[in-house]
Amino acid sequence: MKMKNLFDITKKVIVITGGTGILGRHVAAYLAEQGAVVVIMGRNSGIGEDIVNCIRTSGGRAMFLETDVMNRKRLEHNLKTIMAKFGQVDALLNAAGGNMPGATIPPGSTIFDIDTEDFKKVLDLNLIG
């Protein structure tokens, strides 16, 4: 196998969580440029649709699904949507992350100042999301 074909992602369906964030949107654009079909998941539908439109304008294939990665039922629903449309998921890129909205983590806090449940939510978002 030639090296240039080893990492060919043409027509591969790649799902990106956190796809409306800074990292996710740039990775989505690059993967689409390389020929992948990009499924962008994120919380901001306006930004998500803008990214999809930019990718499509450049000749790429993309779709957006509004998603909060902390909502497992929504993730399962979106996976069914992706499978119905494309029949496959070839790769998953987890770019979701950050602090939990509403978490009580004051600036300058140490790990010992953070509520245990809030800390678990932040870990879930950044490690599992």
Predicted regions and their residues:
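Conserved glycine-rich Rossmann-like NAD(P)H-binding loop of the short-chain dehydrogenase/reductase
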Residues: 36-51
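A glycine-rich helix->loop->beta "capping" turn
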Residues: 58-61, 81-94, 100, 115-118
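Flexible N-terminal pre-Rossmann segment of NAD(P)-dependent oxidoreductases
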Residues: 1-15
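The beta1-alpha1 cofactor-binding region of Rossmann-like NAD(H)/NADP(H)-dependent oxidoreductases
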Residues: 45, 66-78, 116
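N-terminal Rossmann-fold NAD(P) dinucleotide-binding loop
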Residues: 24-25
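Conserved glycine-rich cofactor-binding loop
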Residues: 13, 20-21, 44
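Substrate-binding pocket helix/loop in short-chain dehydrogenase/reductase
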Residues: 103-111, 115-120
